[in-house]
Regions:
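Active-site neighborhoods and metal-handling regions in enzymes and metal-associated proteins
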Residues: 1-264
Length: 264
């Protein structure tokens, strides 16, 4: 209720455009009077689920035979079929792009959340960098990162956070018994989660050990330069695809075999 109230205060006049509807769950929340016996508890004969609430809202608003927007990009097939069976006369329209746009525009408190998460992640990576040397195991690096993040008391390390070296550095894998050698590249792909605030970070970097092949140092420099170019080019209004190409095409000029799904 507090979060809803704060959100409405931020929205101001636009707050009337959304309504929060409660529904039943298996969690039996009771008032103090009910617990002490001062008030009578009336048990429901049946639970009203979120889908029950949805059906009621659609029918009360006379929408069961009209056009309904759904987020098809993330809706699972059984749930969508349930919608079709419940509202056979409705026309379902994919509005996934509208949700993407809504999520891409961050409020000030969300921006601050990401800044805090990134700072905590960076501190964790820094602590790991202090111990990266030949003889250190993958699991030791992972433990160092996790301990640093948990010590903040603000968030938790992502369960998929990985630190790998040698042959394992070329694939996505959980930390195992790999030991850093002076010719290795040490890779990390890790992040932190804000738990029930549902925000997360995802960062990947690599450390090149001192006796690694010279070409690996040149590749590392090119990747770093591409990243710096991308950061320098970032500005409001610039399409993300253009920002991506700034780094991607710079690296690909020198390394035609380069492939990357995202740069961040």
């Amino acid at each position: 209720e507090k979060r809803v109230r704060e959100q409405k205060e931020r929205l101001g006049e636009e707050a009337s455009e959304f309504v929060v509807r409660p529904y039943d769950t298996w969690v039996g929340v009771k008032t103090w009077d009910e617990i002490t016996g001062a008030a009578k508890t009336v048990d429901k004969q049946s639970m009203e689920s979120s889908f029950d609430m949805l059906k009621k809202m659609v029918r009360d608003m006379d929408l069961a035979h009209k056009k309904l927007g759904v987020e098809l990009a993330y809706l699972n097939v059984p749930y969508f079929r349930q919608l079709q069976e419940t509202f056979p006369e409705a026309e379902f329209v994919d509005i996934s792009s509208m949700f993407v746009l809504a999520r891409s525009v961050k409020a000030e408190d969300e921006i601050q959340m990401f800044r805090t998460l990134c700072r905590i992640a960076d501190e964790g990576f820094y602590q790991v960098s202090r111990m990266v040397r030949p003889g250190v195991r993958e699991r030791e690096m992972a433990d160092c990162f996790r301990q640093s993040v948990i010590a903040t008391g603000f968030c938790v390390p992502s369960s998929w956070s990985m630190f790998s070296t040698g042959p394992s550095g070329a694939r996505l894998t959980l930390p195992e018994d790999g030991i850093i050698e002076s010719t290795h590249v040490v890779k990390y792909d890790a992040g932190v989660n804000a738990e029930f605030d549902f925000y997360t970070t995802d960062t990947s970097r690599a450390w090149v050990m001192k006796d690694a092949a010279p070409e690996l140092f040149r590749l590392k420099d090119r990747l770093y330069e591409g990243q710096r170019r991308m950061i320098a080019a970032a500005r409001p209004g610039l399409p993300v695809c253009e920002l991506f190409r700034t780094a991607y095409e710079y690296v690909k000029e020198q390394y035609p075999c380069y492939r990357r799904g995202h740069c961040g």
